[in-house]
């Protein structure tokens, strides 16, 4: 399913019930991108695991609580931990965390926070004794470049230059120390 926020669909669970009847016959797996952590549930995950598991994508938005508060995204580490724990407990070994880069007031510490958040998710996976020697985890960081949009609180905030975004992308790559973490980011010049 593809949307800006899949878990906001008012009848998502009913839709998944219908797709779960159809998908196995067609050898199709279900992937739910752009999930909000505040409405991800055991019921929802059970409906996605009836067919071959693919990855789950969660919007973490920013690498630090300070920056999430600046952009008014009410995602906390506790929600990230709860959501990823639920995914791992239900057999998922791959999660993608979506972040924005170039947000207003962003510092290099916020960029390092992206890598630290991903590492904490890797550590969370291995904190379960069942996963200690089993199959590995893959945490993908996906960073989009912040582009100010009209009619939003940040519409008049200048966008970071391509050079600044490239420096932040390089710093993020240097901050990631684990082979269990993959980093994808948008081309700063086309953003």
Which residue stretches match the model-derived regions?
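Auxiliary Fe-S-binding modules of radical SAM enzymes
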Residues: 88, 111-191
């Amino acid at each position: 399913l593809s949307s800006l926020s899949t878990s906001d669909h008012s009848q998502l669970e009913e839709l998944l019930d219908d797709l779960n009847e159809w998908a196995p016959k067609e050898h199709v797996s279900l992937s739910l991108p752009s999930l909000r952590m505040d409405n991800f549930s055991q019921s929802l995950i059970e409906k996605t695991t009836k067919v071959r598991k693919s990855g789950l994508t969660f919007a973490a938005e920013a690498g630090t609580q300070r920056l999430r508060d600046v952009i008014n995204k009410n995602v906390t580490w506790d929600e990230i931990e709860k959501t990823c724990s639920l995914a791992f407990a239900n057999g998922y070994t791959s999660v993608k965390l979506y972040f924005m880069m170039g947000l207003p007031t962003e510092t290099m510490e916020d960029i390092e926070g992206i890598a630290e958040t991903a590492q904490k998710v890797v550590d969370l996976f291995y904190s379960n004794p069942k996963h200690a020697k089993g199959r590995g985890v893959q945490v993908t960081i996906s960073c989009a470049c912040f582009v100010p949009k009209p009619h939003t609180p940040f519409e008049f905030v200048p966008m970071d230059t391509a050079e600044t975004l490239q420096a932040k992308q390089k710093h993020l790559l240097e901050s990631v120390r684990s082979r269990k973490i993959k980093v994808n980011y948008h081309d700063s010049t086309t953003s």
